[in-house]
Amino acid sequence: MSTSSGTAAGAGTAHVDTFARERLPPPPQMPDLLFELPGLQFGPRLNCASELLDRWVAQGQGARACLIGAHRRWSYAELQAEANRIARVLVEDMGLVPGNRVLLRGGNSPMLAACWFAVVKAGGIAVGTMPLLRARELAAIVDKAQVTHALCDARLAEELELARRQCPTLTQVRHFAVDGGGELAALASSKPATFANVDTAADDICLIAFTSGTTGVPKGTLHFHRDVMAASACWPPHVLRPRADDVFIGSPPLAFTFGLGGLLVFPLAWLFLTAFKTEL
């Protein structure tokens, strides 16, 4: 695989659990990935959570409004603090190691966004799932990705618990409430609001996005930290061209890459505000 940074695939990976990387095509079958544009000059070490969220707080933008939901409104600093606390829960209470797959289940909400950032900060791999999926479909995803951890909206726990009976790898599950209550919030409330992001490689996998399976069994597509930042550097400024006070809103779920990009990754990459239209 050819890259602008000159690093070989997997060089310096931070992942302890290498299950996902081992499922990539062998290097001779990988495409040449050319990052030649000025905005795509990524170094060999990259954690996209640092770039999408932490850098804004470090640059003095922490008080700026970031996410609005039905139950809460967070600034960039508040989102960072919540994500840091949840990352600590994942690592300290749930035993997450870099490279573990974490299933995320919930409607669009600031809390689900914080969970996504927590997984990425901790070096995990986020596996978003549609709220409408039932136990059989969830079990297929857990089995294919060998998911080990899950963070789930308490209102959607029943189907995940049914799926869990068929999935021996899924040993760690915590539930959250979009209004800030629930088991996960209780654990997070005792944690410091700081977290040292895992020093992931630019080509470490941070996301497995499953297709809808309309033509057969859903397939998991693997995305690197660098992929997330490359999309953020290209599409918003050159196609969408948002203005300074624009607010992002939409109905696509964060489990779809279209929703994850359009409602979370792209707005935060350019210091904008997202209003979540619905939470289930």
Short names for language-model regions:
Residues 268-280:
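Short membrane-interfacial helix/loop motifs at transmembrane-helix boundaries
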Residues 50-78:
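AMP-dependent adenylate-forming
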Residues 100, 104, 239-267:
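Conserved AMP-binding loop of ANL adenylate-forming enzymes
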Residues 1-47:
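Flexible, non-catalytic linker and terminal segments flanking ANL/adenylate-forming cores
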Residues 63, 180, 191-210, 217, ...:
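Conserved pre-ATP/AMP-binding loop-to-beta segment of ANL
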Residues 1-17, 117, 121-187, 200:
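Structural core segment of the AMP-binding/adenylate-forming
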Residues 72-74, 89-136, 251-253:
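Conserved AMP-binding/adenylate-forming
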Residues 75-77, 206-230:
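Conserved AMP-binding A3 loop
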